[in-house]
Amino acid sequence: MEEKKKQTEPEACKVAKKCGGCQYQGVPYKEQLKKKQKMVNALLSKYGKVEPIIGMENPYYYRNKVHAAFDRDRKGNIVSGTYETKTHRVVPVENCLIEDKKSQEIIRTIRGLLKSFKIKTYDEDTGYGLFRHVLIRRGFKSGEIMVVLVLGSPILPSSNNFVKALRKEHPEITTVVLNINDRKTSMILGEREKVLYGKGFIRDELCGCTFRISPKSFYQVNPVQTEILYQKAIEFAHLTGKESVIDAYCGIGTIGLIASGHAKEVVGVELNKDAVKDAILNAKENQIRNVRFFQGDAGEFMEAMAAEGNSMDVLFMDPPRAGSDEKLKMI
């Protein structure tokens, strides 16, 4: 039992108080679930029965998407990590307890390569420097890894040698993408991209479907829990194969494509054009023909459907953090 405890409950994160990303860090996982259950009950119990939370067997090192901001400390050493709560000061992070271990190894290697290749990190105050962020996405089932290098200009000095050196240390990397963000903004990714190695995207499997994931695509960061979440959503929808389903805020089409085998037809709507492109390609790659995807605002799209007299039987909705459109209250 003592050995099992060591495996499932690592030491408390050393930067948790500065980072602010894990507010319950140091609290035993079972206690975290109890606290969260109380919060959910308080919010939703007036609407119906609240089922018990389904927790993870091992709630560590699960994130398949890892971001690191780069800067220099007071001594001029290159550091990488996350922003301190409510600031843009970089908190150096060597080991995050919820981020994929391999991705963290790659970030540490990149930090060393910046020093070897004499590449300057970007300074947000002065706008001077080149290297801003690294974004890594890993397919937990496919094993494919995408590394996105975010720069303040479109040119990475000695880019071929840089990529070769990176892949020499981590041959598992299947694609490297250069993203250009030359604006003074808190956004991580810019609009322009250039593929330095590989196809510029990765694939992963979820609930039996294969998904193409680009640098800007939304894809759930916890693949283990996502499968449970989607399966439960489809179960609670009581689909019989006769229903017309709408997947609002569909992203790259994950929920809609997985639900398509249980429904008559599925319509997905998403504002992000890159995500819609991936969703259409995902439908083709999975040979799913009863799904259509549209680019647009989910609320406006469904409002227009209602005005035309079109109806759907089931709505799946996974909105962004800001929440769903106010128009949905009227539909």
Question: Positions of the model-derived regions?
Answer:
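SAM-dependent transferase fold signal centered on methyltransferase-like domains
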Residues: 1-195, 206, 235-242, 310-316, ...
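Rossmann-like S-adenosyl-L-methionine
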Residues: 2-6, 158-160, 164-331
